[in-house]
Curated annotation (Swiss-Prot):
This is L-threonine 3-dehydrogenase. NAD(+) binds at residues 176, 196, 201, 271-273, 295-296. Binds 2 Zn(2+) ions per subunit. It comes from Francisella tularensis subsp. tularensis (strain SCHU S4 / Schu 4). Its main location: cytoplasm. GO terms for biological process: L-threonine catabolic process to glycine. It catalyses: L-threonine + NAD(+) = (2S)-2-amino-3-oxobutanoate + NADH + H(+). GO terms for cellular component: cytoplasm. Keywords: Cytoplasm, Metal-binding, NAD, Oxidoreductase, Zinc.
Amino acid sequence: MKALAKLKKQPGIWIINDAPIPEYGYNDVLIKIKKTAICGTDLHIYNWDKWSQNTIPVPMITGHEFAGEVVAKGDGVTSVDIGDRVSGEGHLVCGQCRNCRAGKRHLCRKTIGIGVNVQGAFAEYLVMPAVNVFKIPDSISDDIASTFDPMGNAIHTALSFNLTGEDVLITGAGPIGLMAVKIARFCGARRIVITDINEYRLQMARDFGATVALNVAPFKNQDELVKQMRKVMSDIGMTEGFDVGLEMSGINSAISMMLDVMNHGGKLSLLGISAGDISVDWGAILFKGLTLKGIYGREMFETWYLMTSMLQAGMDMNPIITHRLHIDEFQKGFEIMKSGQCGKVILDWSS
């Protein structure tokens, strides 16, 4: 079968045409891949950064955002049928630890990821445990279903706290941050402010319903950044700090600024992963009585049902997809992702 694989311990990704079709077991499902989306994690693997060098076994078929069709299943599988349109949870968990047994599988300490630790979805076929498979309703396209993984991250982050009538600050306008704008607006947030240094994506955020999308690139230091943010807050009628903060960037200055402008009793969801150590004003957290929640992946499977219901209720995520390419143009897709001048990039696996 055709696949995209990390074949060498150096930057790049390579297409192969003779990868074996994976074998499925008693409780597994064999999925024919129709669409995949390129994730920031895939870009890290492509660039072969320090995290990738320490994490990714080579060779490895990568990718974990997908939509496809069930073409075979093990004898023990009763939850899906051949012909079903599906996506799937890319985090594989042990099922036996305290958190798994308590229904909190997203907190399994033995989690491994498809396309990271085991064969991924950038291939014509993928094997996945049936318990990880999620049926796609007829009303949701394959393109949108292939973005369920990052959309689930956005849903989990944004809906960890009530957004209705609240003032929301989002730091980081990558695809997940942009999805969070849509989610916050759909859920009735009062004001939504988002920050980034990428003007292309900030304009997308404005189009998605952000009250203000602030380019923070011009500000030379933390004091200037906070001063400008307070001006923005005043200009849009805010008399107190932000009620909810959604941290998507992993950037120290963004986190410090967020702590500075949160209201007393504010709540923060932290999804962004830093490349290094982060220093924070512990006093701001204590004296403001802030609540912080770390986010990793999606709640299995409450997040999946939530995003499906919201899409069916009219939340339009189609504009997050800015580029659609055939798999043979994968190199172009990665170059577009590297440029940052895009939302989600979809790869079509049809022949």
